[in-house]
Amino acid sequence: MVLIKEFRVVLPCSVQEYQVGQLYSVAEASKNETGGGEGIEVLKNEPYENDGEKGQYTHKIYHLKSKVPAFVRMIAPEGSLVFHEKAWNAYPYCRTIVTNEYMKDDFFIKIETWHKPDLGTLENVHGLDPNTWKTVEIVHIDIADRSQVEPADYKADEDPALFHSVKTKRGPLGPNWKKELANTPDCPRMCAYKLVTIKFKWWGLQSKVENFIQKQEKRIFTNLHRQLFCWIDKWIDLTMEDIRRMEDETQKELETMRKKGSVRGTSAADA
């Protein structure tokens, strides 16, 4: 058995704008999660071509310990909380696989994302068979809804309900911003359809861990997209060449940060 959810994140930007904004935000957020021996190590970031599909391939290692719940830390052997993330970004489609060498075939997280120029109304964009699609829970993430944010994660300067973009004149996003966006044809819009499939095969812990991971994925998607919108004035003028240069610099920074200082960023909200 696997647990599958589809998260839909609507944003007031175009699919083209989002490509730069998402890469910028991931690089910045990585720095906030790295330090004290934990965090993100970038092994590869290079173009790929496979069966006619072209894009950017990344291989990252996540060194975790304090970022997993206590009930996992208690039973996990030393050195086992290291996760490999491989991503194939053939934008506007992206596929990410997370694995763990200790658990081998008993664990994976698969995130498949389609970025579409709509308001999150398309059904089964990932083309699942009807029986599988019936089991998928759809979760709508509203980046302007503070009630969807963990209290410990809230930052006023990363709140789309308060933020106004000087460069694009977008925001702040009120309670009915999606309806207003639907009635404003000249403002860009898009939706990230993120299909998350989780397998964790460990007797007695399976459903608890699978639900914990899905909860954490929602938390990550919510926080990242709130940041992405509120950082729009920092990335809206950047090109993909700028982003690749920034990623190279970030890779070096992360390596230095991970080896010193204290643990930073999100800790596990124990489920």
Swiss-Prot record:
Single annotated GO MF:
phospholipid binding
What does the UniProt record tell us about how this protein is modified after translation? Answer: Constitutive phosphorylation of Ser-262 has no effect on phospholipid transfer activity but is required for Golgi targeting.
- What UniProt keywords are attached to this protein's entry? Acetylation, Endoplasmic reticulum, Golgi apparatus, Lipid transport, Lipid-binding, Membrane, Phosphoprotein, Transport
- Tell me if Membrane is a UniProt keyword of this record: yes
Pfam families reported in the protein's UniProt record: IP_trans
Query: Any one cellular component term from GO for this entry?
Result: Golgi membrane
Q: Which residues carry this modification: Phosphoserine?
A: S262
Subcellular location field: Golgi apparatus; Golgi apparatus membrane; Endoplasmic reticulum membrane
- Identify the InterPro entries for this entry: PI_transfer, PI_transfer_N, START-like_dom_sf
Instruction: List cystine links.
Output: none
Entry-linked Gene3D superfamilies: 3.30.530.20
Q: Which reaction does it catalyse?
A: a 1,2-diacyl-sn-glycero-3-phosphocholine(in) = a 1,2-diacyl-sn-glycero-3-phosphocholine(out); a 1,2-diacyl-sn-glycero-3-phospho-(1D-myo-inositol)(in) = a 1,2-diacyl-sn-glycero-3-phospho-(1D-myo-inositol)(out); an N-(acyl)-sphingosylphosphocholine(in) = an N-(acyl)-sphingosylphosphocholine(out)
Q: Which residues carry this modification: N6-acetyllysine?
A: K215
Query: Can you supply a Gene Ontology BP term from the record?
Result: retrograde vesicle-mediated transport, Golgi to endoplasmic reticulum
Under the heading CDD domains, the entry gives: SRPBCC_PITPNA-B_like
Functional summary from the UniProt entry = Catalyzes the transfer of phosphatidylinositol, phosphatidylcholine and sphingomyelin between membranes. Required for COPI-mediated retrograde transport from the Golgi to the endoplasmic reticulum; phosphatidylinositol and phosphatidylcholine transfer activity is essential for this function.
Q: Which family does it belong to?
A: Belongs to the PtdIns transfer protein family. PI transfer class I subfamily.
PANTHER family in UniProt: PHOSPHATIDYLINOSITOL TRANSFER PROTEIN, PHOSPHATIDYLINOSITOL TRANSFER PROTEIN BETA ISOFORM
Its protein name is Phosphatidylinositol transfer protein beta isoform
To which species is this protein native? Mus musculus
Q: What is the lineage of its organism?
A: Eukaryota, Metazoa, Chordata, Craniata, Vertebrata
